[in-house]
């Protein structure tokens, strides 16, 4: 008689590769969303495990949106950590509401296209663009600050490239635990982020955002094609 199939062990190679490709971007997204790397790792571990549990029921084409949806909705990321810290150029991330910050980070840290980022947050295109506009750094006169945008994008790309070896090893352990079905510690529930009324005055020319996102994408592509990514990391998803 055949032994019953082990539903926890032996995950498909495609699933393992997908999670390996997401872990670096997911860790940076989670850390910058809540302002605390440890709290972010709790959220990432929970999202990895939750995704492992339902990936088999999804077409592979739907995997990215589902993963980022799970991570964005993780309770530890719904509010900033009590001791949240964003340093240097990333201090601009402290001001936006959690939803708006997530909209920005799904593009710059998660590497998602606009439609996928909107789907991950459960927003339509217009609502997503409004969230991005609210997350836009402003100068002293309240105008969109292109230099601050570029600085944030460059700082995020630097953080993605330069995660230290011990951090990468921890992320690999989180992935392996998720693939093995290991449970993660429970986290305290957090309040859902406040919704904001769309203020038409805060909308701004999309050529600015599009240009900066293109620069960030070009920087990420250059990093990859120059072979600077660590051998253990797959192409970020």
Segments the model singles out, each with a brief description of its role:
Residues 146-196:
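N-terminal intrinsically disordered, acidic low-complexity segments at the extreme N-terminus
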């Amino acid at each position: 008689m055949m032994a019953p199939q082990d539903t926890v062990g032996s995950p498909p190679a495609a699933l393992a590769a997908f999670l390996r490709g997401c872990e670096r971007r997911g860790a940076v997204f989670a850390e910058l969303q809540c302002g605390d790397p440890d709290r972010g790792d709790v959220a990432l571990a929970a999202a990895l495990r939750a995704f492992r549990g339902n990936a088999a029921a999804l077409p592979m084409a739907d995997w990215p949106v589902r993963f980022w949806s799970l991570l964005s909705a993780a309770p530890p990321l719904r509010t900033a950590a009590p001791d949240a810290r964003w340093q240097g150029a990333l201090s601009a991330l402290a001001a936006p509401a959690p939803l708006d910050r997530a909209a920005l980070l799904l593009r710059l840290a998660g590497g998602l296209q606009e439609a996928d980022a909107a789907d991950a947050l459960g927003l339509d295109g217009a609502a997503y663009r409004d969230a991005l506009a609210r997350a836009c750094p402003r100068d002293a006169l309240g105008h969109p600050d292109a230099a601050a945008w570029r600085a944030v994008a460059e700082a995020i790309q630097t953080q993605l490239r330069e995660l230290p070896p011990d951090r990468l090893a921890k992320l690999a352990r989180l992935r392996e635990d998720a693939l093995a079905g290991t449970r993660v510690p429970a986290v305290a529930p957090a309040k859902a982020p406040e919704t904001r009324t769309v203020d038409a005055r805060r909308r701004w020319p999309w050529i600015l955002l599009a240009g900066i996102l293109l620069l960030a994408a070009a920087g990420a592509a250059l990093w990859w094609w120059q072979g600077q990514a660590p051998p253990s990391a797959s192409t970020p998803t």
